[in-house]
Amino acid sequence: TTEYPWNGDIKIAVKKSGVKNASLLVRIPGWVRNQVVPSDLYKYSDAEKPAYSVTVNGKAVEADLNANKGYLPVKNIKKGDVIRIHFDMPVRTVVANAKVADDNDKIAVERGPLVYCAEAVDNSNEPVLHAVMPEKPSFTLVDNYSIQNTETKGAPAFTVKAIVTSPAHIIYQKKEDVVAVDCTPLTLIPYYAWNHRGANQMNVWFYQGLSFMDK
């Protein structure tokens, strides 16, 4: 049983085991091991160090993940065993490899395995493509944030765990060399959940701080 990916608690109850000395390989995801993807394309830019735990009937199970290609072997499972897995799930910030020029000086936001985005419909129709994150953003989780699908008649609303940021900057181009800056928190939703509510702006990669305007 689990509510993953909304939280990091997973319970596996062994109802029966037809194989003697059976083993279970528990995948410890890359994001738990501070690896956004299995390459240097992206990396985390914060100082978070998510912890994880795996227990069998309350007893901790440990192993060298590198030796097991990211899997933690749980050996000799039997009927009646209860395996509990926990992953810390802080909100993380991600940067791209410097060779990805379009993403230089920008961050993305991730929680667990989910990438988040800002959609204008959740942010008073502000131009989220011009949103700039603070130098040191903070994040607040919002449970059961409702998204009503307006693109498909009769489609039910669905809920997600949203993220609200500390006040971000919205940049408005007033004249050729004149800009206005407004400060407002941003509401972020999981990337998979966007584009259900009509045409509007969406952004994943945000400039961080206003120093980019000097370049």
Each model region followed by its residue ranges:
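Short, flexible loop/turn segments at beta-strand junctions in immunoglobulin-like
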Residues: 74-76
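C-terminal beta-rich recognition modules with glycine/proline-rich loops and embedded aromatic residues
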Residues: 1-13, 36-56, 65-72, 86-215
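Non-cytosolic beta-sheet module surface loops
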Residues: 2, 14-18, 28-30
